[in-house]
Amino acid sequence: MIAMGAKGAGYARGASKQNYATPACLIEPVKAMLGIKRFAFDFAADRFNAKADDWWTERDDSLVKTPQDWLDAVGTGWGWLNPPFNDITPWARRCRQLQRLGGSVAFLVPASVGANWHRDWVHDKAYVLFLNGRIPFMPDKPTWGYPKDCYLALYTPGRHAGYDVWSWRED
């Protein structure tokens, strides 16, 4: 997970409420659902929390990269993106731009269906899976979850936009 910097994307770990790494207990079911063994690229990571073998860091600044740069990074595989939750608009826009170029990305965000970014860049453009159950972003506190519901927006060519609920946990 990343936090915003002055120039755009900043990638930092820490206690900020906007800055949580995606736990493996979610990543593994996502990969299984997508039918992949690994993500091709993580668009917002650092060496401690990357969900792919390749990623962009704060110095790389994902949001100043072009949509073509994003496509070149992900290739024909799936990208992963867990952006900072404080300013989602530029990230959602870039996911849509990647999709229009033929790329695929799984985008983890709060389920803020009333937000402008959702209306403009997700609603009729991505396949949305509402996550059944809160995500435990802090692994040392198994009962702690992000205080809001989240969803996974799947941007990929050829898949119709829509909504569903996904029970990702093994309960």
Question: PLM features: residue spans?
Answer:
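Class I S-adenosyl-L-methionine-dependent methyltransferase catalytic core
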Residues: 1-171
